[in-house]
């Protein structure tokens, strides 16, 4: 038999390699299944409790293990018999909620715990495996990669149909390039008057962004806790804000991509990179704030969007967030961005639709990203008011919110302290003269000066355009015009603007604050603040003693206009958090740095 030619060998090798690469990834390893723990019992509340249970059983010699094959195929995590290859159990890859590794903790030295949602059953279970051959760390990494590939390779289809299971079928979509997406444009289908049609038109992105369409039903509207605000909801305005927020995020990503390319060219030609392509720390902070603000907007719009769902946009934002974090020059900068805190609706939305890798990314950002306003135990963050690169401003707020989209406070109009008509009798109109012969007409005489109407803020409100006014809970305001649902008010700093009337309550005579006392529970920073007031503000914000000593000698004007580079030199450890706080104060006061 003659030896095959070199060309024949090459062609056979080429065909062999092409066949291998065209086949779906098949992960298959031999493991030892130790036990499965149902979570939610009195002793097992999470993966750590399951491991502790294993340690106890191992010490007592009660572990009944079984060797088997752990395999990933066609989007399923399968447990197979070693000899017959019979399927013993299986779970959807996207039902995996967490994976943890425990090394050298007992007689089993390489344990992988996988927490999954049981198919068709409520609650979760934790499976424990001894990974002697492959190693728990390596197997965890392989499973995470398989899960990411599975999420990316789903066919791009429409949203979930009624009755369609969230995790089965083609509901999850493959990554959608940003150049194929469009921005929101309001449009109400006639057959569904309370649903919105959402379209996107985003500029080209350096990376494709994933899409996802599953979401759970939103919870019923409830009155927010007294210490936090629930901004009156107007979906059309929220859509407009979201449009511009997403556009600014994309613009920042484009700048980041250009900066990265510039850095690569400098490295190629041996030049030193002295900057980040013109991107400042404040720009990174602004982008992180806008991403958080987007989550809050999507939480409010979750039941309003139709064709493009809120979870789809959440996945787009997380892809963008991952892209930005990978290129951020300061690793912990995002975790220090506190304002704006997420709303409970935003938290619920993220919990309902994030994939395991996205959930890990989210949790890794810390409490400032994972704690809702209602559960935040730190210092009260200052209100967040976004500014836009194109100087776009919102139109005047509408007088009524659409049906099905009323704000939580307005749903409680039965309370006598809420509502625009329950505070005091409405004034009579004076837009005409008395009619001749009217027995009630009397010669006009100067009217005594009416005392200024004082109100107290029940819930904080963030201004969304120059016509509105940012207020905080407990602030005392003077009402200038209360003829409409949105009232014109003036704060003690002399700034005036519109706020919704249903976040106010009457200020009774003799209430502290009626004589010009400070309306805030914490010291306020203003341009006119003296050094001792700046010191009080820094201490109230829980900055370190060194920071208070360094910056406490400045006036409010000096601190609010300090440059990021100067602040970095003076307070290198806390500069990011100080910048974030100062930016929030600037927005509230309506000043530029």
Curated annotation (Swiss-Prot):
The keyword Cell wall biogenesis/degradation does not apply. InterPro entries: EPS8-like, EPS8_2nd, EPS8_PTB, Eps8_SH3, PH-like_dom_sf, PTB, SAM/pointed_sf, SAM_3. GO terms for molecular function: actin binding; guanyl-nucleotide exchange factor activity. Residues 425-435 have a biased composition (Basic and acidic residues). It is found in: Cytoplasm. Residues 28-155 form the PTB domain. Residues 149-171, 184-239, 374-451 are annotated as: Disordered. Keywords: Cytoplasm, Disease variant, Hypotrichosis, Phosphoprotein, SH3 domain. GO terms for cellular component: cytoplasm; plasma membrane; ruffle membrane. The modification Phosphoserine is found at residue 231. The keyword Membrane does not apply. Residues 386-401 have a biased composition (Polar residues). Residues 450-509 form the SH3 domain. Gene3D superfamilies: Pleckstrin-homology domain (PH domain)/Phosphotyrosine-binding domain (PTB), SH3 Domains, Transcription Factor, Ets-1. SUPFAM superfamilies: PH domain-like, SH3-domain. It comes from the Eukaryota. Pfam families: EPS8_2nd (PF22975), PTB (PF08416), SAM_3 (PF18016), SH3_1 (PF00018). Belongs to the EPS8 family. It is linked to Hypotrichosis 5: A form of hypotrichosis, a condition characterized by the presence of less than the normal amount of hair and abnormal hair follicles and shafts, which are thin and atrophic. The extent of scalp and body hair involvement can be very variable, within as well as between families. HYPT5 is an autosomal dominant form characterized by little or no scalp hair at birth, wiry and irregular scalp hair in childhood, and sparse or no forehead and parietal hair at puberty. Eyebrows and eyelashes are thin, and pubic and axillary hair fails to develop. Interacts with ABI1. Part of a complex that contains SOS1, ABI1 and EPS8L2. Interacts with FASLG. This is Epidermal growth factor receptor kinase substrate 8-like protein 3. It comes from Homo sapiens.
């Amino acid at each position: 038999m003659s030896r095959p030619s070199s060309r024949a060998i090459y062609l056979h090798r080429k065909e062999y390699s092409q066949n291998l690469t065209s086949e779906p990834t098949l992960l298959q390893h031999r493991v030892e299944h130790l036990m499965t723990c149902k979570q939610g019992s009195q002793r097992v509340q999470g993966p750590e409790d399951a491991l502790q249970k294993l340690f106890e059983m191992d010490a007592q010699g009660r572990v009944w293990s079984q060797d088997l094959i752990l395999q990933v195929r066609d989007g399923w995590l399968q447990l197979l018999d070693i000899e017959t290859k019979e399927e013993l159990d299986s779970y959807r890859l996207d039902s995996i909620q967490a994976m943890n590794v425990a090394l050298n903790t007992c007689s089993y030295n390489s344990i992988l715990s996988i927490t999954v949602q049981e198919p068709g059953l409520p609650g979760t279970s934790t499976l424990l495996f001894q990974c002697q051959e492959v190693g728990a760390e390596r197997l965890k990494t392989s499973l995470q990669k398989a899960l990411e590939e599975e999420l990316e390779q789903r066919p791009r289809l429409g949203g979930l149909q009624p009755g369609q299971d969230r995790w089965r079928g083609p509901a999850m979509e493959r990554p959608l390039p940003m150049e194929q997406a469009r921005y929101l444009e309001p449009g109400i289908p006639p057959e569904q008057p309370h649903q919105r049609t959402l379209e996107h038109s985003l500029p080209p992105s350096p990376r494709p962004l994933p899409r996802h369409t599953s979401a759970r039903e939103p919870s019923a509207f409830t009155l927010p806790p007294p210490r936090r605000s629930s901004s009156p909801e107007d979906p059309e305005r929220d859509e407009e804000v979201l449009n511009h927020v997403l556009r600014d995020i994309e613009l920042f990503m484009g700048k980041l991509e250009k900066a990265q390319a510039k850095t690569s060219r400098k490295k190629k030609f041996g030049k030193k990179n002295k900057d980040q392509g013109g991107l400042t720390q404040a720009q990174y902070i602004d982008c992180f704030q806008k991403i958080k603000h987007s989550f809050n907007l999507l939480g409010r719009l979750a039941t309003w969007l139709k064709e493009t769902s809120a979870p789809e946009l959440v996945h787009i934002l997380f892809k963008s967030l991952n892209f930005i974090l990978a290129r951020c020059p300061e690793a912990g900068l995002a975790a220090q961005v506190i304002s704006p805190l997420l709303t409970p609706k935003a938290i619920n939305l993220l919990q309902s639709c994030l994939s395991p890798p996205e959930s890990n990314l989210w949790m890794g950002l810390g409490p400032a990203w994972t704690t809702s306003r209602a559960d935040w135990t730190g210092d009260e963050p200052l209100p967040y008011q976004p500014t836009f690169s194109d100087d776009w401003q919102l139109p005047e707020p509408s007088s009524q919110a659409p049906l099905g989209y009323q704000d939580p406070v307005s749903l409680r109009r039965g309370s006598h302290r809420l509502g625009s008509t329950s505070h005091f009798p409405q004034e009579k109109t004076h837009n005409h003269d008395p009619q001749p012969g009217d027995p009630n007409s009397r010669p006009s005489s100067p009217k005594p000066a009416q005392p200024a109407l004082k109100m107290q803020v029940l819930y904080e409100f963030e201004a969304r355009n120059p016509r509105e006014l940012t207020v905080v809970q407990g602030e005392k305001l003077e009402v200038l015009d209360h003829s409409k649902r949105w009232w014109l008010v003036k704060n003690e700093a002399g700034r005036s603007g519109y706020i919704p009337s249903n976040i106010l309550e009457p200020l009774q005579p003799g209430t502290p604050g009626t004589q010009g006392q400070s309306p805030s529970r914490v010291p306020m920073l203003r341009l006119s603040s003296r050094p001792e007031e700046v010191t009080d503000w820094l201490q109230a914000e829980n900055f370190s003693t060194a920071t208070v000593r360094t910056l406490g000698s400045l006036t409010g004007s000096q601190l609010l206009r300090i440059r990021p580079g100067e602040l970095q030199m003076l307070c290198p450890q806390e500069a990011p958090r100080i910048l974030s706080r100062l930016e929030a104060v600037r927005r509230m006061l309506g000043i530029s740095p």
